[in-house]
């Protein structure tokens, strides 16, 4: 348990930040699922538009510090490779 006032405040700040980051991570997962559903359904146009939205959301989360930049880049790269392979 936090003893000092500053430690108590840090506990409150961490709880707020955790909630915000959890929401951001959930939002990213939702956008990624939309891309994956479009890929499995075979709808290439929907997959491309969903990929653009998912990439934007992923990079926003990277900028906010929710994901490491390499993690974001890896996820975008793998998703775009899967969308690209639909046309081949």
From Swiss-Prot:
Superkingdom of the source species: Bacteria
Pfam families: Ribosomal_S20p
Keywords from the UniProt entry: Ribonucleoprotein, Ribosomal protein, RNA-binding, rRNA-binding
Record's signal peptide: none
Alphabetical list of SUPFAM superfamilies matching this protein: Ribosomal protein S20
GO process terms (BP): translation
Gene3D superfamilies in alphabetical order: Ribosomal protein S20
GO function terms (MF aspect): small ribosomal subunit rRNA binding; structural constituent of ribosome
Xref: InterPro entries: Ribosomal_bS20, Ribosomal_bS20_sf
GO cellular component, one term: cytosol
Family: Belongs to the bacterial ribosomal protein bS20 family.
UniProt xrefs under NCBIfam families: S20 (TIGR00029)
Function as written in the Swiss-Prot or TrEMBL entry: Binds directly to 16S ribosomal RNA.
Protein's recorded name: Small ribosomal subunit protein bS20
């Amino acid at each position: 348990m936090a003893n000092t006032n500053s430690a108590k405040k840090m506990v409150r700040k961490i709880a707020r930040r955790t909630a915000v980051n959890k929401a951001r991570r959930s939002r990213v997962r939702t956008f990624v699922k939309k891309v994956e559903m479009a890929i499995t359904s075979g709808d290439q146009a929907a997959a491309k538009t969903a990929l653009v939205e998912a990439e934007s959301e992923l990079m926003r989360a990277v900028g906010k510090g929710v994901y490491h930049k390499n993690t974001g880049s890896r996820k975008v790269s793998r998703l775009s490779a899967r969308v690209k392979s639909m046309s081949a």
